[in-house]
């Protein structure tokens, strides 16, 4: 399987850099796997595609401010993980200003580079907790071409976000309002989205790609609901990867579990749990493009993307969505 097989050309003006005024006003392309039919609908039509005994599974992770700008200026800290309130694992730039034992300040807190990891990440120890509400920013995807605004605090967060820990939003969930959610039989899993979600696959052969690892949790009530459901509709690639990862370790069944997963789903993968998927439009050559191709077939996905471009759909995190049935 070649990475180049998942490429497409997107006119830059179709990248949605701002959300629509209303969450649920997005367009929704419906892709039928069996017939190859492609329909153009709106997200408000989503409930009409549910059958009796269907279960909608969503990711209830909450995006945390992960981008910090030290008082010294000209530097940026991207927190990948808060190991404790006083110890962070970070990516930083420029690296030369963050050598071992170097210090910097975030408000009243002093950070010290305590370890430089092999991959260039840093462990930083603080003398007191950082005031995240004041100094933290949302790490919006680079393709939005802008810094975060106050409105993103609400809109780059799902209405059902509960468990803090993501750097990026599980974007398929952004379309839901409480009113839509109330109409649907649903359950939650948690997967904390890491920075790896945006990284393109840089190797020529897909199987050589090393997948990033992300923390997840499946509660008992969700496991029971999934196993009793007729068809599971995953909202987003993150919910998909969580369910499939747990099923892979448990002979096809979903059980209550927590841990880390680096599951990489690409064409040839046999889905054990997920029967339908609501997802946004993804970056070329990304692992997410490969995941949707595993479910619907690469040719049908590329055809659907070409049609989305022709019909001027809005792409990526703040963009429109696709329902694969």
Question: Where do the model's predicted regions map?
Answer:
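Surface-exposed, charge/polar-rich loops and edge strands
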Residues: 1-325
């Amino acid at each position: 399987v070649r990475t180049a097989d998942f490429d497409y050309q997107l006119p830059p003006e179709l990248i949605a850099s701002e959300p629509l005024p209303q969450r649920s006003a997005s367009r929704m392309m419906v892709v039928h796997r069996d017939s190859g039919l492609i329909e153009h609908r709106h997200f408000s039509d989503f409930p009409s595609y549910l059958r009796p005994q269907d279960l909608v599974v969503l990711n209830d992770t909450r995006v945390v401010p992960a981008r910090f700008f030290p008082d010294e200026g000209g530097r940026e800290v991207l927190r990948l993980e808060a190991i404790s309130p006083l110890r962070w694992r970070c990516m930083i730039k420029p690296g030369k200003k963050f050598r071992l034992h170097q210090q910097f300040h975030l408000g009243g807190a002093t950070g010290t580079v305590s370890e430089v990891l092999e991959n260039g990440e840093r462990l930083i120890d603080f003398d007191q907790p950082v005031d995240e509400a004041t100094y933290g920013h949302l790490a919006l995807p680079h393709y939005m071409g802008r810094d975060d605004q106050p409105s993103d605090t609400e809109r780059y967060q799902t209405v059902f976000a509960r468990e803090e820990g993501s750097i990026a939003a599980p974007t398929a969930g952004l379309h839901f309002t409480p009113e839509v959610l109330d109409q649907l039989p649903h359950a939650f899993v948690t997967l904390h989205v890491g920075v790896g979600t945006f990284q393109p696959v840089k190797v020529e052969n897909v199987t050589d790609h090393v997948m990033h690892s992300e923390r997840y949790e499946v509660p008992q009530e969700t496991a029971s609901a999934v196993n009793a459901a007729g068809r599971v509709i995953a909202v987003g690639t993150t919910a998909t990867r969580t369910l499939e990862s747990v099923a892979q370790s448990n002979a096809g069944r979903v059980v209550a579990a927590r841990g880390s997963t680096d599951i990489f789903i690409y064409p040839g993968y046999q889905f054990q749990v997920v029967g339908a998927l609501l997802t946004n439009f993804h970056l070329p050559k990304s692992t997410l493009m490969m995941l949707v191709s595993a479910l619907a077939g690469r040719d049908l996905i590329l055809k659907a993307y070409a049609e989305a471009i022709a019909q001027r759909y809005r792409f990526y995190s703040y963009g429109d969505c696709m329902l694969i049935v």
